């Protein structure tokens, strides 16, 4: 049906232009090739779905990781990390970190905060740079805690993402929140 509309459109262009019959035949041939090629695209839905097969498993791992952080169970968290982990920390101007840098950050939070609680707003599947679901996990939420040295409360909106390797270990992690602003508020006299 759409092909008929295209032919009618081309015929209308021919009638209202200075194109000769030879040029119109070339245009029709070209449009036919484009149309036939577009009908021959492969179904990529199966490929996209298959790359997202591990999302449910990875979602449970990410949720467990956050619960373990609330419980300050660093050793169990470390067991969930790939040796090749890359971490994108939330601090202003910070470079990417390796596994040891990420573990050091986790330990720093656990040593300096108590009653940590993460309340998720949205758990979402992640995607690659083309928008294809890829099994990664991301979440928006709010951290609440008490800063142990000052006993000041924290209420911090955050975004986190996790990419996983084939065995279900975290291979890339990113944390986005105002870490610098949070620390400055905890050290101010207000």
Where are these regions (language model features)?
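Low-complexity, intrinsically disordered terminal/linker segments enriched in charged
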Residues: 171-190
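A mature extracytoplasmic/lumenal domain signature
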Residues: 81, 91, 141-143, 160, ...
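Hydrophobic pocket/interface hotspot
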Residues: 65, 76-78, 85, 102, ...
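Short, low-complexity N-terminal intrinsically disordered segments enriched in polar/charged residues
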Residues: 39-75
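Exposed beta-sheet edge and beta->alpha loop/turn motif
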Residues: 140-169
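A solvent-exposed, acidic/Ser-Thr-rich amphipathic alpha-helical stretch
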Residues: 74-129, 133-135
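Bacterial Sec-dependent N-terminal signal peptides
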Residues: 1-53
């Amino acid at each position: 049906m759409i092909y008929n509309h295209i032919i009618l459109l081309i015929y209308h262009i021919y009638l209202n232009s200075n194109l000769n019959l030879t040029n119109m035949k070339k245009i029709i041939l070209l449009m036919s090739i484009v149309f036939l090629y577009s009908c021959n695209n492969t179904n990529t839905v199966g490929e996209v779905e298959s790359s997202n097969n591990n999302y449910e498993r990875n979602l449970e791992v990410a949720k467990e990781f956050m619960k373990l952080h609330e419980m300050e169970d660093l050793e169990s968290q470390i067991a969930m990390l790939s040796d090749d982990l890359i971490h994108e920390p939330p601090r202003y101007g910070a470079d990417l970190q390796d596994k040891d840098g990420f573990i050091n950050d986790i330990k720093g939070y656990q040593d300096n905060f108590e009653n940590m609680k993460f309340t998720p707003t949205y758990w979402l599947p992640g995607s690659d740079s083309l928008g294809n679901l890829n099994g990664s996990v991301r979440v928006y939420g709010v951290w609440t805690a008490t800063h142990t040295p000052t006993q000041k409360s924290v209420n911090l909106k955050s975004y986190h993402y996790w990419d996983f390797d084939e065995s279900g270990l975290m291979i890339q992690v990113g944390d986005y929140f105002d870490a610098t602003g949070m620390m400055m508020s905890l050290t101010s006299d207000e």
